[in-house]
């Protein structure tokens, strides 16, 4: 017998397995423990003084549970199949490659960085302020920027594709069960390396190719049709199509496209800072209690407001996380956030960013479609020039001092491993960002009383939340509007944002590639 239950319980009732089973047993009227269950959905309702958990459960009495998967996957042998070049191994590239295999095409994945184990060593040196590798860092390398992040899988992009399918692929490759039922699923930076390594194994086992240290430096074009790519080591890779999934930080790709007179466009994006609070403070604000206890997860938040005609909002909020260095160039400071699966650090951080439109950048119009990219680069260099001279040290300021416009005499404890130095960020941040941030922080404190705290620190700069460039594609075929066979994909194309939407875009592009090749 199978039955479904919708339960609203206290966190301790859900978190204690014996208590939870007892409640299920009572609900189904089963006199024995001869049942198993699977959680279908779990969310937290923290609107009242006593947070509750809403749990949807499927119960199996006297029979084995059915599979948790709603989708079927058929990875076939594509060793001798038609090759398709996939540039980049982030979520968009990986999911494009896996879908191509299902559709009968051989992906040739070219990754400019290193495999994930070597990448971890380079990142460790970067965290210790000892070395910086332009091709192996928090943005570049196996799995892309998402590998060393919180691994958040929540997305509002429900029309882009099959979200459940993406979650199941991650789960099949080693992600935890909870991503299939949590309202806001995440994998965690400690588990993501295993997942992306398993995805690589699937690709290679099926006959696909996966090549590291393969930085694309040129495109092979004939009569406005792409035939392949050249890499920095002099190798050439040909394919029936090229999927360009290079991520939002591959500035050299944008420059290459512009150099070859391939159309790119300026688009709106966002930049700002990363704000860090003690996790206990965010817990008190969000859960309305002094201590969240052992059964509630580290509290998160999502806030947004319109300030002077532009959005100011939280981005990539990492409860129980750390701030990390995310620059891809020397002489520049970029920060981002990440969390382990347990989200068990003492800090809560989030990007707080300001919407920027191309028309806001009147001083950069000489850079054409790359005006936002140039603005982004200059702000990252300004942050480096105000970081006290360290390799990856970041400028910082107490949140209250930032809002009132004074230099901080001291800084709160901060999770950023390379270290922070007090800097008058209110002074050197561009007015279109700094002014809106100050007003935004004051408004956020009205929604989350206590957010504007002297215990909070602002760290700069959060500049890679989205791409300032779009590589335009045909609305029907998803090919580039000018170059046949070139399929821009993922965050770097300007058509996705975040792991899940990038993964869905990767699958979409693989299907569009197959449609094109099946017609010829």
Model-based region annotation:
Residues 2-51, 57-148, 152-520:
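Residues forming the flavin
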């Amino acid at each position: 017998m199978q039955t479904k239950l919708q339960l609203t319980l206290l966190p301790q009732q859900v978190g204690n397995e014996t208590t939870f089973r007892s409640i299920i047993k009572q609900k189904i009227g089963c006199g024995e423990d001869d049942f198993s269950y699977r959680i279908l959905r779990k969310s937290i309702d923290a609107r009242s003084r006593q947070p509750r958990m809403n749990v949807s459960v499927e119960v199996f009495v006297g029979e084995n549970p059915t599979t948790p998967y709603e989708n079927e996957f058929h990875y076939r042998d594509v060793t001798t199949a038609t090759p398709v070049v996939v540039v980049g191994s982030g979520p968009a590239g990986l999911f494009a490659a896996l879908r191509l295999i299902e559709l009968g095409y051989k992906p040739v994945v070219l990754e400019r960085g290193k495999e994930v184990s070597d990448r971890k060593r380079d990142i460790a040196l970067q965290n210790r302020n000892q070395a910086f590798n332009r091709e192996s860092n928090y943005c570049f390398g196996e799995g892309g920027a998402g590998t060393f992040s919180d691994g958040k899988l929540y997305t509002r992009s429900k029309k882009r594709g099959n979200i459940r399918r993406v979650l199941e692929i991650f789960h099949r490759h080693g992600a935890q069960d909870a991503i299939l039922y949590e309202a806001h699923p995440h994998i965690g930076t400690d588990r993501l390396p295993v997942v992306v390594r398993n995805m690589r194994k699937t690709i290679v086992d099926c006959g696909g190719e996966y090549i590291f240290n393969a930085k694309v430096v040129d495109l092979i074009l004939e009569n406005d049709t792409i035939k392949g790519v050249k890499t920095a080591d002099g190798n050439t890779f040909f394919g029936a199509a090229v999927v360009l999934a290079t991520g939002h930080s591959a500035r050299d790709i944008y420059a290459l496209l512009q150099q070859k007179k391939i159309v790119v466009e300026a688009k709106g994006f966002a930049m700002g800072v990363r704000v860090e609070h003690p996790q206990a403070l965010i817990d008190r604000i969000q859960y309305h209690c002094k201590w969240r206890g052992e059964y509630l997860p580290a509290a998160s938040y999502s806030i947004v407001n319109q300030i002077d005609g532009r959005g100011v909002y939280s981005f990539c909020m990492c409860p129980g996380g750390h701030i990390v260095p995310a620059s891809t160039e020397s002489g520049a400071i970029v920060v981002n956030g990440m969390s382990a699966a347990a989200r068990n650090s003492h800090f809560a951080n989030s990007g707080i960013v300001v919407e920027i439109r191309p028309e806001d950048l009147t001083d950069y119009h000489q850079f054409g479609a790359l005006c936002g990219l140039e603005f982004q680069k200059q702000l990252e260099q300004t942050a480096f020039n105000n970081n006290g001279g360290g390799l990856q040290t970041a400028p910082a300021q107490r949140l209250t001092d930032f809002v009132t416009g004074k230099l901080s005499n001291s800084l709160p404890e901060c999770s950023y491993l390379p270290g922070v130095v007090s800097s008058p960020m209110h002074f050197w941040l561009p007015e279109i960002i700094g002014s809106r941030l100050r007003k935004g922080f004051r408004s956020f404190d009205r929604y989350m009383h206590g957010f504007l705290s002297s215990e909070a620190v602002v760290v700069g700069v959060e500049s890679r939340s989205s791409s300032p460039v779009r590589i335009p594609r045909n609305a029907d075929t998803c090919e580039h509007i000018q170059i046949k066979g070139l399929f821009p994909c993922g965050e770097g194309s300007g058509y996705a944002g975040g792991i899940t939407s990038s993964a869905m875009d990767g699958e979409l592009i693989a299907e569009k590639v197959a449609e094109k090749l099946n017609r010829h």
